[in-house]
């Protein structure tokens, strides 16, 4: 033993430092699980969160023991009845295009896929208002998602131009004399053709008075930022319907996204045979099992529970002190600490319905609404904060959870892998094909899909966030009381059409602007 120690004692300080450095480099390789906070098993020793345990144990047990009647299943999966409204954009015929365009309009769109989608609709409307030619919008790289996908990477450009050819002039790129008008050009100084001061929800008159004169003087104007830069009210009916025509008819995803989406939908509707429908099962039981499972049907759950959402909410998600510190640091870095919710307690936020539903809570909601554990449930999400440990309770309630990676091969996903906007586009496409859609928290994707599905009269469940926040805070409720409260609180939140009110978004409520009452 002394002979083994002697060489170490003879090492000088620099040699010891080098040896320690090698050990630090090798440590993660020798013990990788300690550095894998998003692994399927558990958080790491150096994770920023602790594995959350179920917050609602009694409700969870009640959900696992629940009995769901066939009648309840049939009602749940039945399509919406005709509500007396139909899309109007197809019957709309705008005024013919003037012979001459006033010039070119460029817009630069930030945000995620659905915020950019709304910006594209607004850009077409603004171009129509000013009688200018729209250059295909430039999609900025989002600071959170880090996706550099362009318009043509996501949307079918030929279809877009064809659908709108009688409404607005659209060009793929600027003529050579305006080739200087680029993002880099506007990033390096003050430019006369750049409009940085477009107010949020600007009126049509604002564009005619402030942007059109620049286009008439220089032949072009670039508006950036442009997100949410057109009002929802006091616009001509033709402009409102044009926005919906862009949103619901002109914006088709590129073929490879649609093909992948169709493949996923087919696999969701036609799962492999399982033991539950094989063997010597009694024919009556076999029929009941098929009915209970909603044969050939599936629901999509948009589970927006990424770090960005968790941090911005200011809520506590049972990840311990490490998680609280990590989310506080994230708020400081991203928003310089200016997050309104951070001044309230967790209980106050939950009572006001301001906390996004955790995977556990959305699982309990689905169970109370009558979804059985046989439900084919497609999970539309980018990345769940807390990884598999956070989803484990939801998976316990619904073993049939699927997502892109479980349904498709690596080869099939190659064109979208690592590209947040393309992955979101696939989720959007699958969501539009589902029998039922439900989102765990408000947001742009929730709003966009709620509107699109309302436009087509498809069933969409809108969680009552205030009610749910209050019942989850109330630890005295048993399962039957919780189930009753949830059912009563969601009777009129399963796709019933709601008319847009003043100042509300046309991209959330398409009626009555884009829909007509059927006589």
UniProtKB/Swiss-Prot annotation:
**Biological process according to GO:** fucose metabolic process
Using the UniProt annotation, give the residues that carry a glycan (glycosylation sites). Answer: 131, 373, 474
Documented EC number(s): 2.4.1.-
Listed GO CC annotations: Golgi cis cisterna; membrane
Q: What is its main location?
A: membrane
Q: Which family does it belong to?
A: Belongs to the glycosyltransferase GT106 family.
This protein is called: O-fucosyltransferase 31
Q: Where located? A: Membrane
**Keywords on record:** Carbohydrate metabolism, Fucose metabolism, Glycoprotein, Glycosyltransferase, Membrane, Signal-anchor, Transferase, Transmembrane, Transmembrane helix
> What GO MF annotations does this protein's record show?
glycosyltransferase activity
Q: Which Pfam families match?
A: O-FucT
Report how it sits in the membrane. Answer: Single-pass type II membrane protein
Q: In which pathway does it act?
A: Glycan metabolism
* Designated gene of the protein: OFUT31
């Amino acid at each position: 033993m002394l002979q083994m120690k002697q060489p170490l004692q003879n090492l000088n300080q620099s040699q010891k430092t080098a040896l320690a450095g090698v050990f630090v480099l090798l440590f993660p390789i020798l013990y990788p699980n300690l550095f894998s906070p998003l692994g399927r098993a558990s958080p790491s020793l150096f994770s920023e969160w602790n594995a959350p345990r179920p917050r609602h144990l009694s409700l969870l047990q009640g959900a696992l023991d629940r009995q769901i009647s066939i009648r309840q299943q049939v009602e749940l999966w039945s399509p919406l009845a005709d509500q007396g409204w139909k899309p109007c954009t197809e019957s709309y015929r705008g005024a013919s295009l003037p012979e001459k365009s006033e010039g070119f309009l460029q817009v630069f769109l930030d945000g995620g896929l659905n915020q950019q989608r709304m910006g594209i609709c607004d850009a077409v409307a603004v171009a129509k208002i000013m009688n200018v030619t729209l250059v295909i919008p430039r999609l900025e790289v989002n600071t959170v998602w880090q996706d550099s996908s362009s318009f043509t990477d996501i949307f079918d450009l030929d279809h877009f131009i064809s659908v709108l050819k009688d409404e607005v002039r659209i060009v793929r790129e600027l003529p050579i004399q305006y080739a200087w008008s680029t993002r880099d050009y506007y990033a390096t100084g003050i430019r006369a053709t750049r409009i940085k001061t477009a107010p949020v929800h600007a009126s049509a008159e604002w564009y005619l008075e402030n942007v059109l004169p620049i286009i008439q003087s220089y032949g072009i104007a670039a508006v950036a930022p442009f997100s949410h830069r057109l009002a929802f009210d006091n616009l001509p009916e033709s402009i409102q319907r044009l926005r919906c025509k862009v949103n619901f008819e002109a914006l088709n995803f590129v073929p490879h996204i649609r093909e992948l989406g169709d493949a996923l939908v087919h696999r969701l509707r036609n799962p492999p045979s399982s033991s539950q429908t094989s063997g010597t099962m009694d024919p009556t039981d076999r029929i009941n099992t098929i009915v209970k499972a909603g044969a050939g049907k599936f629901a999509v759950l948009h589970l927006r529970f990424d770090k960005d959402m968790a941090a911005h909410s200011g809520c506590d998600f049972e990840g311990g002190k490490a998680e609280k510190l990590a989310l506080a640091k994230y708020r400081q870095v991203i928003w310089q600490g200016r997050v309104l919710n951070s001044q309230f307690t967790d209980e106050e936020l939950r009572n006001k319905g301001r906390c996004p539903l955790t995977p556990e809570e959305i699982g309990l909601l689905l169970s109370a609404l009558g979804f059985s554990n046989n439900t084919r449930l497609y999970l539309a999400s980018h990345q769940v904060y807390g990884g598999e440990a956070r989803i484990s309770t939801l998976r316990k309630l619904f073993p049939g959870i699927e997502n892109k990676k479980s349904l498709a091969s690596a080869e099939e996903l190659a064109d979208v892998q690592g590209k947040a906007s393309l992955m979101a586009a696939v989720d959007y496409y699958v969501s539009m094909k589902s029998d039922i859609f439900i989102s765990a928290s408000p947001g742009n994707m929730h709003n966009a899909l709620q509107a699109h599905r309302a436009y087509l009269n498809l069933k969409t469940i809108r969680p009552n966030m205030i009610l749910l926040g209050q019942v989850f805070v109330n630890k005295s409720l048993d399962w039957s009381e919780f189930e009753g409260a949830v059912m009563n609180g969601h009777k009129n939140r399963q796709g019933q059409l709601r008319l847009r009110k003043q100042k509300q978004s046309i991209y959330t409520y398409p009626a009555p602007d884009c829909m007509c009452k059927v006589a």
